[in-house]
Every structure is written in C-alpha cells, then in structure tokens.
Amino acid sequence: MLLLELKKTNQTLETIHFIGIGGVGMSGIAEILYNLGYKVQGSDLVENYNTKRLESYGIKIFLGHAEQNITNVSYVVISSAINPKNPEIKEALERKIPIIRRADMLAELMRLKCSVAVSGSHGKTTTTSLVACLFEAAGLCPTVINGGIINNKSTNAYLGSSNYLIAEADESDATFIHIPSTIAIITNIDPEHLDYYRDFETLIGAFRSFITNLPFYGFAVCCIDHKIVRKLVDDITERKIVTYGIDSEDAHIIAFNINTDIASSTFDVKISLPNVLGTTIIEKITIPTPGRHNILNSLAAIAVGIELDFGIKAIKNGFNNFKGVKRRFTKVAEYNNASIIDDYAHHPEEIKATLATAKNIANKQNGKVIAIFQPHRYSRMQYLFDDFMLCFADADILYITDIYAAGENPIEGITGRSLVDKITKRKHHDKANFLAELDDAVGVIIDNAASGDMIIMMGAGNISSFANELEGRLSSRGFSCHTVV
C-alpha cells in the first residue's frame, strides 16, 4: 500500500480491477480504495444494489466478464467465489498482471490501523455494525468494511478519519487467519464451509490461529455459550480473552432480565472482567432489533467498548443509533395484518435463531409462524442435510423451495423436494410442503396469512428480491399489501 501511496502522490495512478465487484465483500473494499483516492473499476455478471451504488460514485462497472475489461489495469482483485476459468483471470495470468486475493487486499488496508476483526459462523455482519456504532458514539470515526448493508449508512463500507478499522473477517477459505487484527471477535463456530476445510477440526484450528495470531497487546472476545468456542477458549492461554454469554455464569459479560418484541430487545448486563475487582451492572440496554442471537451480538460489542473504556453512556448511545442491517430480520411488508420478514438465514443454526425470534413475537400476537425457505448451494445441503431436517421446529407452517445453486452443479438426491420428503417421513414437521416455484409463495401468503402472523422468507439466494417485490405481486392479483420503508 505504501508503494501505491507513493504512485498516487506522484500522479501516476494505476487501475485496480475487481472481478465480482458486486459481491458484498468485494464492493466494500472497492469503495474504501476509491474513497482513499485510488482508481478503481470492476466487473460482475449482473447489476445489483452494490454495483449501482459504486457506479453512482463514478466507479466504472462492466456487466459481464471479458478479456477486454482489464485492458489498462495494473492489479486484479478476486475472491474465492471467482472461478479460476474466468476470462479476466486467464487474461491477467497471460499478461502477468498481479492477482490479489480479497483477503490480502483487506489485510493491506488493516495493516497500519488498529483493527477489530469480527468472525464466526453466524452474526458477523450485525456484530460488525454494532461495534462500529459504539466506536462512533465514543467519538471515534472508524473505517468500516462489512458483509452487509448497514442501514444507518446505506452502504457496507465507509471511510473514517481515525486510526481504527472494523472489518468482517470471512472464515470461508481460511484467509481470515492472515488478517493483522488487534482485536478478534468470535461469535460462534459451526460446521460450515466444509467443502473447503473438509472436516470440522480443521475449521476449529483456523479459529484457534485467528486468536493466537493476535499481537501480545491485543485481545479476543468470544461467546462461550457456544460449546465449541468454550472449548477453544479453555485451550488457549497465550492471549487475553474476554468472554460473553447469556447462559454461561462464568462469562465476563452476561446479559439478563431480557425482554424482546418485534422491533427491539432490552436487557441488563453484568460485567466481571479478569484482573478487575468487583462487578459492574449496566441496566436497561436497548438494541432496536429482536432476538436472543442479537443480544449475544451486542454483548460482543459491549466487551470491546468496556475494554477500550468507551463508557456506559457511549455504549447506550451507540446502540440507540443502530438501525439494523439489511436482510437481518428485516420487515419488508404487511399483508392482512401479518408481518413479512426478509432474512439471510441459510444455515441450520441461523434458521433456528430466526424462527425462535419469530415464534416469540408471534406468540405475543396470537399469531403463527409461516416459514418459506430457499436452500442455498447443493454442497451445503449435502453436508448439513440432517441438521436441515431438524431446524424448522418453530415454524407452524413450512414451505421449502428447490435449491438456489449459486453456480454449483446439482448433486444427485440433494434437492428441496428430497428435504421435504425426509422431514415428513421422519415426522420432524407435520406441515412441511415443497414449493415448486418461488412465485407460488404469493399464493401461500394469500391462503395462510392472518393477523399477528410472522411470514419469514429465508435464504441467501434470490428470495430476498422476491420478498421485496411482494407488494407488486400481490396487487397484480387484486390484493392489497403495505410495503414497509
């Protein structure tokens, strides 16, 4: 980065090209580099929210991948999601243009900063956003690179003026262990990305390295309600670790007196830090998002704020300023006095957390939970098939579509219909249905929605676009639907 800075100063700007620039991780880094003054461009297969946003800043976006897209570039940035046979990669190799992995570019941005890296199987994006809100409330102005759109900012990345950088650290391909972080957060560890790691123990080992690679003056923040994380923490003695939880009485930071509704969660916090005498109680902390899992995410942010002496007022103000993250239990519409929720949940543990939150709210409203789930990736379904069969218990009515491939080839016997058949055969759910076409979900909503119901549309594929288009789809059939802005 220092060499690039020198070239920038000397007015000899070189172009950095991002393949797959519309991806949430890639778009964030591209935006930060652009705001730092670098010349940035990129390509993606289709236009989306991220490409439109970047284009509005003046960043050149190519739709489609082609050799000519990198005619005048000096560096190419890729993520692990990019196929090695991509024509732009092949052209870069042919012309010996340096190809930089997304994680390596993120590491360069973090290298000269005091950095907070947030990792874990679930909750990374929300936790990153919450930490950022506390930094801002404390009078610091961090640079933030997130894995989702932060509603406060309408972007997933923004440049700050301080020496702090807060980033979501993607564990999918083990590159997160090379990120030069000062503070590391681990929200949880579940079997995920086993197509890369091959076995769970290797994945756990990567998280261990994530902690032990911290400098001696840094610290980790870990959720020990999760048994795998607890075991990991118990085995590490060479780094400072601050723990948090709801059920773990020995955690350093514990939430209690919990109340939650459709829009928020309120709780008290007990703080008993290592090597600090006495206990501190913070009463009535409120976060404007529901769910036990989000309370845990907020505890991670509190741990960072307490360790960095932000003060209780800044912590409370930071949470008050938090407006949520796009696609994390986002209410997008109302139909027949039922709430329609768009959620990114695509792993069994995420699904359980989302449906548990919905069930809690529906019970208070004398309603039911209607879950419409679009599976994501054949490989994930194959590795976690048994877990998927068991994760829908809190749905009163369940509909499962076919699998959103995300570029993968089909795997024999692994389909949305086969999942429904197994759930029904083994009596894990008595109202599980296969939805042949996502468009059929409109009829499901018309036929089933009643006052107080929670309609949860989940998945990492195109179900989000569908959920956000429901007003038009329902009105075209003569039904009134109120979109929530």
From Swiss-Prot:
Pathway assignment: Cell wall biogenesis; peptidoglycan biosynthesis
Top-level taxon: Bacteria
Protein family: Belongs to the MurCDEF family.
GO biological process, one term: regulation of cell shape
Alphabetical list of InterPro entries matching this protein: Mur-like_cat_sf, Mur_ligase_C, Mur_ligase_C_dom_sf, Mur_ligase_cen, Mur_ligase_N, MurCDEF_pg_biosynth, UDP-N-AcMur_Ala_ligase_MurC
Listed name of the protein: UDP-N-acetylmuramate--L-alanine ligase
Enzyme Commission (EC) number: 6.3.2.8
Binding-site residues, ATP: 120-126
First-tier enzyme category under EC: ligase
Protein encoded by which gene: murC
Function: Cell wall formation.
GO cellular component: cytoplasm
Subcellular location: Cytoplasm
Molecular-function GO term, any one: UDP-N-acetylmuramate-L-alanine ligase activity
